[in-house]
Amino acid sequence: MITQRISKLREKMMENNVQAYIIPTSDFHETEYVCEYFACRKYMSGFTGSAGVLVVLLDKAALWTDGRYFIQAANQLEGTGIDLMRMGQPGVPELDAYIVENLKENDTVGFDGRVMNTKDALAYKSVFDLAHLNMNVNLDLVNDVWTDRPELPSTPTFHYSEKFAGESMESKLSRLRAFLKENKVDSIVLTSVDQIAWLYNLRAHDIPN
């Protein structure tokens, strides 16, 4: 099943002139735990751990994960044709170095930029530019392969009771404003969903418990 999905992904890669495709474990907000709609790395690799990045080339594939998941990943990747890259271990290349080593000048690296944080994307770009590789950041190729992909959830938000939150929204905002004033800051921009949910005591059910 995994090998068939990888084969279909490679077909889409060739259609889009992409020689390497990166699939991180993330969503549009870089949430630590993602809903099933964003479980692209799990779908394409069969690896169910919470952390890992899959890279698919036209002739090989590899998955990077940390020490928490070495045994699990080795078991789940068996027979898939995906090599396990044990992060931090001797002789294991960095993801970008692996891509550079296996691609040639003017080849293209693709990924869905909506689920890649800016810091990582810029770091990749600096390495790929030196190797004269192109980047296409507007490709959700997994969506073309995952024909029964779950719908993007949109559950209603609700106010989390102060009884359980331990502090009211008004109190949190007051403390935040006092902190900003103390540090001579006019405003703050929050983009992390969990920070916003905590500050305003908001919750939803997009991600199952």
Regions found by a protein language model. Give the residues of each.
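Terminal domain-start leader segments
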Residues: M1-N209
